[in-house]
């Protein structure tokens, strides 16, 4: 997210912001009020507390809430160690400076001083929301640096990813940071783009699962974020991962269908499932409209359709770019008006754009209500984090956990799981140390710790060379040669910051290669550590600081080095350290064993040695395709059928396909079956496959589930990932892996851009990679003569508050109970009433009327009527002698939602949509289509629309028959 600076050294994290309340330093302290103000009462709702606090704030204070700060490296503390408010706008000394020696403990002490001053010396005592980076670990000196995001994606292990971000969030919060700008949920479909390393790869489903894991790891499971968690920020919204030409911030001009089916998927999951607290707009434009002023994107989709209730932040200098880059605003004041009206709540970086709002409100150019709305969302974030109750942290705890033993071991575990075995001819790997006398470790990436972008000096670091030496000990001789240089920039994380990077002098590499050849020739095995470094693939934020490439070949003299070593005849292993897939054609053809490590983080050397010598069996899978050359781009696996042509005199078959990864053992996939193999639209089936470890080593395999619809009203990808599970198996062990295929899984956007399930034949494919699967067919038949069965938004849980009880409501069903529910837990705000009214369907005497309003969204808006056949959600009814559920409905024309809860499905009910038309209409759903046999029916729910606004509908003659 760094800003586009004009100075020689100015990456944006230097101005990572902090929320300001201007009264902290512009007004004298006031006497304590006689009564505790409402905003100080934790028993009140967040909305009530925000409203009270806003009523007490000046315009200047409210604008300060939505503006970032600037770091000029001035001290906040005087000689006595006390906080100096006169320097507050300079932020924190060195906390984000590349030359800083500030430790997390020192940062915690400084932030405590800031919070104490604000709490004790300012009239309103509004706490500071400190923000930071945690792309793959809290970005601070001494913190734990976990594997880069692309490496984490290679684990195909969301549970592990959640643990990583739980640790990262705890380290950040312990240092006083309340919000981090992660996860990156961009879909990387052009590896020329330097920020590919920051992503979870090219697939929307994989990115969504990893993204939700990251969000819940950072924030925890509860809406209120405790003092071991931080608020997450989903970025960059949206269409940032496939820029024109692969250059950072370039346009993302794709159709709404492509955007919804690919780029928006992980963001929707982060909002609806993870309840992410913040979303960051992206630099790029979509169809001529920059994301920062894109009403369709930020309002219609994010807030109205998905019910997002958090706050939207700009990217660093994103608002300035409206004037200086996109030229859609004549000046900063106009940029502020446009962005605020669109729904951007926070001006990241120095806040200079939104500070123009003070005068604009006074002049009548901007309604103060728009400032209130944005400031209120920032204040709500502080309340959600509990900062008004306790803004302080314990520096001793900070010191204890930061890069402590538990987090270091987790970093090793994550790095081990991330390694992908790409090739292993004649089982060269794992290396048998008993047969080796001399091991040559060669390459420009061997001796340094490469952690990837958005990192600082980790608390501990192990290079691959050091890891091998530690593992080998005295069992063999380990010799080292650099082989060649890639660039003249500093190695490791400092290279990510370097400006005006130059490739190393080719002539100077000749003697280095010669020296490496001499070592390789005398060794029993050569381990070549090549690829990229942090200065060659990274975020490009200025002409002096680039990171995108027009070639994916190994840079500099690395291919010459590899060729020279291979030609010695010494068995050779290539270990790749890089942040994007590379066109390693010579390596793939001539080197017998290849491992992909990406940037493995601070413990990468230990993990690499574990894999090389067989202590750990590699089980990672590629989250992105390896092309032969940039001429093959785009080459993502889930392309459309018409994209099937190759090029003259060459092939477009990837070097390594999405989902690919070998093992030191072998696995067999058998007995793929569907139960049932035929369902109605809206139905549910199970896919099961048996996996057996047929080799002699324990190892991990990933069962990857893909789908293709043979005939549809809109062209479909040749295949798309819909499920996966990583399993560990001992030699000879067999396990059955099961996947549930739901209407949401089978759904598509039809010609009217409605999400539906169309009847037809679906190919269900399972295997160890996208190019190696077994296939069965699923037949989906029509339901009620509909061309396509609508699919409602995915469920988020049943956290609801009982508002009223209408057990005596008269309906056709003569058992159970009715209750009205609203979302009162998950951060949204919904109201609903239910009553019996005269004039039902088919001349009946009465019906049930439900009306309500979704006035604030945060995840799932859960407002409507619940019917409990057994008398309550925890009292399921056995209705297995019944076949169907039917009801009559009418209303105001909005699309409402029908849910079926069963004890088996738990918090994952089956969803259907129904349109509450002005005239009565009957809907009938079979138990089979709802994925149940009726033996454990807990509840039926009739809910209003997912978006914000008022609704009204009527239900009558609900029958289970």
Show where each model-derived region lies.
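Beta-rich carbohydrate-recognition modules and glycan-binding surfaces
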Residues: 789-961
């Amino acid at each position: 997210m760094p800003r586009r600076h004009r100075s020689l050294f100015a990456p944006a994290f230097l101005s990572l912001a902090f929320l300001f309340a201007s009264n902290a330093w512009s007004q004298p302290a006031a006497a304590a009020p006689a009564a505790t103000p409402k905003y100080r009462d934790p028993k009140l709702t967040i909305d009530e507390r925000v409203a009270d606090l806003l009523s007490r704030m000046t315009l200047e204070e409210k604008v300060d809430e939505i503006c970032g700060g600037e770091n000029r490296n001035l001290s906040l503390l005087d000689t006595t160690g006390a906080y100096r408010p006169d320097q507050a706008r300079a932020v924190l000394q060195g906390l984000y400076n590349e030359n800083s020696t500030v430790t997390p403990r020192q940062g915690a002490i400084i932030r405590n001083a800031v919070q104490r001053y604000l709490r004790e010396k300012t009239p309103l005592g509004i706490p500071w929301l400190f923000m930071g980076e945690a792309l793959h670990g809290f970005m601070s000196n001494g913190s734990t640096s976990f594997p880069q995001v692309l490496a984490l994606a290679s684990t195909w292990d969301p549970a592990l990813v959640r643990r990583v971000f739980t640790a990262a969030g705890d380290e950040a919060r312990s240092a006083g940071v309340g919000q981090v700008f992660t996860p990156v949920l961009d879909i990387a479909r052009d590896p020329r783009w330097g920020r590919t390393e920051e992503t979870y790869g090219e697939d929307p489903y994989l990115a969504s699962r990893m993204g939700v894991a990251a969000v819940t790891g950072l924030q925890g499971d509860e809406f209120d974020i405790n003092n071991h968690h931080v608020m997450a920020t989903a970025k960059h919204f949206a269409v940032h991962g496939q820029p024109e030409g692969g250059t950072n911030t370039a346009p993302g001009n794709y159709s709404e269908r492509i955007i919804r089916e690919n780029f928006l998927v992980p963001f929707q999951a982060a909002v609806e499932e993870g309840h992410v607290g913040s979303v960051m707009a992206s630099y790029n434009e979509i169809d001529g409209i920059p994301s920062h002023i894109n009403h369709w994107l930020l309002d219609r989709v994010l807030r109205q359709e998905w019910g997002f209730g958090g706050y939207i932040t700009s990217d660093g200098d994103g608002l300035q770019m409206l004037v200086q880059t996109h030229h859609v605003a004549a000046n900063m004041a106009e940029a502020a008006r446009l962005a605020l009206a669109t729904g951007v709540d926070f001006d990241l970086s120095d806040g200079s754009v939104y500070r123009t709002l003070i005068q604009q409100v006074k002049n009548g150019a901007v309604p103060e209500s728009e400032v209130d709305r944005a400031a209120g969302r920032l204040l709500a974030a502080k309340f959600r984090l509990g900062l008004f109750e306790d803004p302080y942290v314990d520096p001793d705890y900070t010191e204890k956990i930061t890069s402590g033993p538990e987090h270091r071991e987790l970093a090793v575990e994550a790095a081990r799981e991330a390694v992908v075995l790409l090739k292993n001819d004649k089982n060269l790997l794992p290396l048998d140390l008993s047969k080796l006398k001399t091991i040559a470790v060669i390459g420009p990436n061997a001796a340094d710790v490469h952690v990837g972008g958005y990192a600082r000096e980790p608390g501990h670091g192990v290079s691959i060379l050091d890891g091998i030496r530690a593992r080998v000990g005295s069992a063999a001789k380990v010799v080292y040669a650099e082989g060649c240089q890639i660039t003249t920039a500093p190695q490791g994380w400092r290279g990510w910051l370097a400006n005006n990077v130059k490739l190393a002098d080719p002539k100077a590499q000749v003697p280095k290669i010669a020296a490496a050849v001499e070592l390789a020739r005398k060794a029993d095995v050569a381990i070549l550590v090549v690829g990229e470094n942090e200065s060659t693939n990274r975020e490009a934020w200025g002409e002096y600081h680039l990171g995108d490439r027009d070639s994916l070949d190994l840079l500099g003299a690395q291919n010459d080095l590899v060729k020279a070593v291979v030609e010695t005849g010494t068995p050779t292993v290539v270990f790749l350290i890089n942040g994007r897939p590379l066109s390693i054609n010579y390596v793939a053809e001539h080197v017998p064993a290849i491992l992909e490590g990406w940037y493995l983080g601070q413990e990468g050397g230990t993990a690499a040695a574990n894999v090389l010598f067989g202590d750990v069996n590699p089980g990672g899978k590629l989250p992105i395709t390896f092309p032969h050359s940039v001429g093959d781009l785009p080459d993502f696996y889930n392309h459309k059928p018409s994209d099937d042509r190759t090029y003259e005199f060459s092939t477009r078959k990837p070097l390594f396909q999405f989902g690919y990864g070998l093992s030191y053992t072998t696995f067999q996939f058998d007995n793929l079956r569907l139960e049932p193999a035929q369902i109605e639209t809206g139905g549910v089936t199970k896919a099961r496959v048996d996996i057996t470890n047929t080799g002699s080593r324990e190892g991990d395999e990933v069962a990857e589930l893909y789908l293709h619809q043979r005939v549809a009203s809109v062209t479909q990808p040749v295949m798309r990932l819909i499920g996966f599970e990583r399993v560990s198996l001992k030699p000879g062990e067999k396990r059955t892996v099961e996947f549930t295929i739901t209407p949401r899984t089978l759904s598509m956007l039809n010609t009217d851009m409605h999400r539906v399930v169309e009847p037809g034949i679906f190919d269900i494919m399972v295997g160890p990679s996208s190019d190696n699967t077994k296939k069965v067919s699923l037949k989906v038949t029509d339901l009620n003569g509909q061309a396509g069965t609508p699919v409602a938004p995915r469920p988020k849980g049943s956290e609801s508050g009982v508002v009223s009880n209408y057990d005596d409501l008269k309906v056709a069903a003569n058992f159970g109970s009715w209750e009205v529910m609203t979302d009162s837990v998950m951060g949204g705000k919904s109201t609903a009433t239910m009553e019996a009214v005269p004039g039902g369907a088919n001349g009946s005497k009465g019906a049930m009327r439900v009306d309500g309003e979704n006035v604030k969204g945060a995840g799932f808006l859960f407002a409507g009527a619940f019917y409990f056949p057994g008398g309550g959600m925890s009292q399921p009814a056995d209705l297995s002698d019944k076949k169907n559920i039917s009801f009559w409905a009418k209303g105001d024309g909005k699309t409402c939602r029908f849910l079926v809860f069963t004890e088996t499905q738990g918090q994952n009910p089956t969803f259907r949509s129904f349109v509450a038309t002005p005239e009565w209409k009957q809907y009938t759903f079979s138990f089979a289509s709802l994925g149940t046999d009726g033996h454990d029916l807990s509840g039926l729910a009739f809910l209003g629309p997912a978006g914000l606004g008022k609704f009204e509908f009527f239900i009558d003659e609900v029958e289970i028959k």
